[in-house]
């Protein structure tokens, strides 16, 4: 394959999404989660964290409790990396999330290459920078404002919960947010608005919300979107207008995966801490 043929990489990613042995028959949602968590460590005040560097290759970040289960996503992408050794892990992880969203009937998300892979743990961000689903609106604002997002963007990014499910042995929570967790839509917002949600304590002591028939769940952080007037306004808008949600989600997810990437006037990412030795992407934990 020609070096720099990102369309070929896109096609290869799309080809591995269907997987009968994984949740709901698709690895798409966990690839979106990988792109999200690889980017969501950014701190605008210090310029640290973000998608550049692929720092989840290193034990310190890989072992952050918020990243439990993402070793699966990283391993799923190893055959792609082997087939296209010229692509950095930082680019591969973010591109995989973008492709997964599109393949699950979501919006097209702008994506640019150029991220680099850091050579060691020096620039691994501190643990604890990712959202905690057990918390409420104040926590969401603390986390997302740190990255540079506003209230509308917070709600739009929460819409990623249209995909995937929680696992008690990973996050402590259990279940899916929507009936079809491998199709991107605005169902998450409709359900927040229209279902009756009851706070329940799981057998592990973790609290989450269930709908009346206990088929679907919401995290306390999800439900806080209904309790905060500014957040609630955007939940209402996105529940009523799928096209508006798709438009806003595309923009904000593109912004998310660019966090930590320093680009020059030509749009190319500035080279920094390149891993020229192709270090082990999955350090022994």
Curated annotation (Swiss-Prot):
- Give the positions of the site Transition state stabilizer: 33
**Is Metal-binding given among the entry's keywords?**
yes
One Pfam family this chain carries?
Answer: peroxidase
| Co-factor binding comment | Binds 1 heme b (iron(II)-protoporphyrin IX) group per subunit.
Q: Where in the cell is it found?
A: Mitochondrion matrix; Mitochondrion intermembrane space
> What does the record give as EC number?
1.11.1.5
Matching Gene3D superfamilies, A to Z?
Answer: 1.10.520.10, Peroxidase, domain 2 (1.10.420.10)
Protein keywords: Heme, Iron, Metal-binding, Mitochondrion, Oxidoreductase, Peroxidase, Transit peptide
What cellular-component terms does GO give this entry?
A: mitochondrial intermembrane space; mitochondrial matrix
From the UniProt record, which GO molecular function terms apply? cytochrome-c peroxidase activity; heme binding; metal ion binding; peroxidase activity
Record field: catalytic activity: 2 Fe(II)-[cytochrome c] + H2O2 + 2 H(+) = 2 Fe(III)-[cytochrome c] + 2 H2O
Q: GO biological process: what's one of them?
A: response to reactive oxygen species
Cofactors named for this entry: heme b
Q: What is its main location?
A: mitochondrion
Highest taxon listed in the record's lineage: Eukaryota
Positions with a binding annotation for heme b: 161
Known partners and oligomeric status: Forms a one-to-one complex with cytochrome c.
Family affiliation: Belongs to the peroxidase family. Cytochrome c peroxidase subfamily.
Quote the protein name from its UniProt record: Putative cytochrome c peroxidase, mitochondrial
Q: Which organism is it from?
A: Yarrowia lipolytica (strain CLIB 122 / E 150) (Yeast)
């Amino acid at each position: 394959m020609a070096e720099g043929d990102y369309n070929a990489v896109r096609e290869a990613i799309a080809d591995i999404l269907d997987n009968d042995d994984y949740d709901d028959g698709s690895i798409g949602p966990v690839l979106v989660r990988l792109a999200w968590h690889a980017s969501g460590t950014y701190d605008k005040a210090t310029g640290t964290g973000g998608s550049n560097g692929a720092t989840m290759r290193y034990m310190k970040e890989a072992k952050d409790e918020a990243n439990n289960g993402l070793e699966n996503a990283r391993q799923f992408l190893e055959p792609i990396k082997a087939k296209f050794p010229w692509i950095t892990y930082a680019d591969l992880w973010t591109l995989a999330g973008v492709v997964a969203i599109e393949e699950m009937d979501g919006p097209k998300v702008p994506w640019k290459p150029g991220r680099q892979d850091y050579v060691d743990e020096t620039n691994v961000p501190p643990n604890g920078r990712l959202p905690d689903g057990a918390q409420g609106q104040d926590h969401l604002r603390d986390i997302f404002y740190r990255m540079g997002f506003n209230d509308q963007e917070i709600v739009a990014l929460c819409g990623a919960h249209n995909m995937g499910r929680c696992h008690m042995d990973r996050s402590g929570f259990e279940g899916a947010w929507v009936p079809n967790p491998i199709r991107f839509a605005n169902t998450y917002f409709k359900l927040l608005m229209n279902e009756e949600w009851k706070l329940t304590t799981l057998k592990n002591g973790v609290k989450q919300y269930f709908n009346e028939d206990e088929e679907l769940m919401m995290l306390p952080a999800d439900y806080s979107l209904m309790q905060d007037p500014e957040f609630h306004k955007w939940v209402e808008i996105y529940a009523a207008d799928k096209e508006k949600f798709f438009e806003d989600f595309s923009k904000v997810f593109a912004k998310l995966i660019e966090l930590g990437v320093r680009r020059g006037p030509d749009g190319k990412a500035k080279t920094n801490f390149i891993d020229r030795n192709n270090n082990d992407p999955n350090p022994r934990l």
